Each structure stands twice: as structure tokens, then as C-alpha cells.
Amino acid sequence: MARVTVQDAVEKVGNRFDLVLIAARRARQMQTGGKDSLVPEENDKPTVIALREIEEGLITKDVLDARERQEQQEQEAAELAAVSSIAHTR
């Protein structure tokens, strides 16, 4: 199990409050969204994995925002395609 120091992660993000928000978002993605870890899991909990990803510079607020925007666009496109196919069958 790798040791994570919060100070190292804070230096990547800027302040501890943003660190908490970003780490919580990422941990939630891994727990409920089925997102894969970007670092070896090593039997760590999602919160520790999220902090390790932030510490290594793999996850930032901008990265999370971009991923969520992309997923939202893909979902909207799928919904539009479904509605379009229903409209064409009528």
C-alpha cells in the first residue's frame, strides 16, 4: 500500500478545499460510475486511489470536467439517435 501525503496532493491542486472536492468526485466515479483507476489499486480504497491519481498529476478538475462533458455529449447523442429511430418507424 503506497503512502499518500495530503500535502503533496494539495501542491498539485492549489488548496485543500479544492482537493477534497476533486478527490471526492473522482472516488465517487470509481465507486458508482464504474470508472477504472489510473494507478495500481493495491487494495486501496477509492478515496486513497483518487488522492494518488491527483498526486501523480493524472486527475485535475479540468480533466474531470472534460470527461463529464464528453460523457454527457455521448449520452445526449445516444438519446437523440433513439428518438430519431422511433420517429422514423412511425
From Swiss-Prot:
Matching SUPFAM superfamilies: RPB6/omega subunit-like (SSF63562)
Matching InterPro entries: DNA-dir_RNA_pol_omega, Pol_omega/Rpo6/RPB6, RPB6/omega-like_sf
GO biological process: DNA-templated transcription
GO MF: DNA binding; DNA-directed RNA polymerase activity
Keyword Acetylation included in the entry's annotation: no
Reactions this protein catalyses: RNA(n) + a ribonucleoside 5'-triphosphate = RNA(n+1) + diphosphate
First-tier enzyme category under EC: transferase
Region (Disordered), start-end ranges: 69-90
Domain of life: Bacteria
Cited function: Promotes RNA polymerase assembly. Latches the N- and C-terminal regions of the beta' subunit thereby facilitating its interaction with the beta and alpha subunits.
Subunit record text: The RNAP catalytic core consists of 2 alpha, 1 beta, 1 beta' and 1 omega subunit. When a sigma factor is associated with the core the holoenzyme is formed, which can initiate transcription.
UniProt cross-references to HAMAP family, sorted A to Z: RNApol_bact_RpoZ
Family named by the database record: Belongs to the RNA polymerase subunit omega family.
Identification of the protein by name: DNA-directed RNA polymerase subunit omega
